């Protein structure tokens, strides 16, 4: 194909991508910004349910107090009950938060009341937690020492003070409320379409030139996706804080939690711009910035803080 014809195809492809991008925008009520999304709530929830079922099957006996586990100790029952109690309070808070946004004039489709809220605990040293689209939540026991007394071992003492665990769970639920999983899939798909458009224009180039262009586009796309991911993490932190206060958990525990998270792995991590998550120090600083408003709301809704 001649260069002019190939160039025209690239231009039309880029115009098509731009039209596709701007015609699939929705307002994020938690930020007020328009964001790209092509995956419906129903589709995302279906995928979330499938992924969650696969995860539970893979974990098998590691799912605390499940049928696959066979037995359920008193400690296991207390742990699962605590997680589910926190989850129920955050579920109610999520519904209330969306209702308040609608009453404030935001136009969006609330999702929290539609979710199939499910909370399970996974016996694993991995310090992790997640909430898939549809409200499917998993808490790994490895996170409990970070949210608990931070003494290097996981015991029931780690769930006596539930506020930091509520911070983690509120953050993960915030991802689901803001459709971050769907938006991540949408942006990945957009990057793939862009890669296809770039590939059309490589035919007349040498192999070395093609490799350079592919590498440059790949780095740019990856950098863009990482930036989206960091932004989503910050959004989920803010939404989680809103849920935390509405559920009457102490918001002041959040900064210390992220300081502890920053110490995992000896504090070694890549630069923030090369990561999908903001630095723990950045997150702790964000929470301190948001804290006066959160404390004021807590006092108005709940009780006086010590």
Where is each model-derived feature located?
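Peri-catalytic and regulatory segments of divalent metal-dependent proteins
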Residues: 2, 14, 19-189, 202, ...
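N-terminal Sec-pathway targeting helices
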Residues: 1-11
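Short, low-complexity, glycine-enriched hydrophobic/amphipathic alpha-helices that associate
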Residues: 160, 174, 178-227
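Metalloprotease/metallohydrolase-associated module, dominated by Zn2+-dependent proteases
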Residues: 204-253, 271
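Alpha-helix N-cap and coil->helix boundary residues
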Residues: 160, 164, 185, 189, ...
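Generic alpha-helical structural context detector
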Residues: 53, 88, 167, 192-195, ...
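Extracytoplasmic and endomembrane cell-envelope/extracellular-matrix remodeling and assembly machinery
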Residues: 237, 250, 255-306
């Amino acid at each position: 194909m001649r260069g002019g014809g190939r160039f025209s195809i690239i231009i039309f492809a880029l115009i098509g991508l731009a039209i596709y991008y701007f015609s699939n925008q929705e307002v994020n009520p938690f930020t007020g910004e328009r964001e790209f999304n092509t995956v419906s709530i129903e589709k995302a929830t279906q995928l979330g349910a499938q992924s969650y079922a696969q995860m539970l099957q893979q974990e098998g006996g590691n799912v605390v107090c499940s049928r696959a586990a066979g037995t359920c100790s008193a400690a296991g029952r207390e742990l699962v009950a605590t997680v589910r109690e926190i989850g129920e309070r955050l579920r109610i808070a999520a519904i209330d938060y969306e209702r308040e946004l609608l009453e404030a004039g935001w136009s969006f489709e609330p999702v929290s009341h539609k979710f199939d809220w499910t909370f399970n605990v996974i016996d694993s040293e991995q310090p992790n937690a997640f909430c898939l689209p549809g409200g499917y939540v998993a808490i790994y026991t490895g996170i409990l020492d970070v949210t608990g007394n931070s003494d290097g071992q996981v015991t029931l003492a780690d769930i006596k003070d539930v506020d930091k665990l509520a911070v983690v769970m509120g953050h993960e639920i915030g991802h689901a409320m803001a459709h971050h999983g769907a938006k991540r899939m949408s942006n990945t798909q957009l990057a793939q379409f862009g890669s296809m458009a770039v590939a059309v224009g490589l035919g007349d180039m040498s192999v070395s030139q093609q490799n350079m262009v592919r590498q440059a586009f790949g780095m740019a796309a990856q950098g863009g996706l990482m930036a989206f991911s960091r932004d989503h993490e910050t959004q989920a932190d803010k939404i989680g804080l809103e849920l935390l206060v509405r559920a009457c958990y102490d918001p002041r525990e959040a900064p210390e939690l992220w300081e502890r998270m920053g110490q995992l792995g000896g504090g070694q991590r890549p630069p923030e711009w090369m990561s999908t998550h903001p630095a723990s120090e950045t997150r702790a600083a964000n929470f301190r910035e948001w804290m006066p408003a959160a404390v004021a709301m807590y006092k108005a809704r709940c009780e006086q803080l010590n």
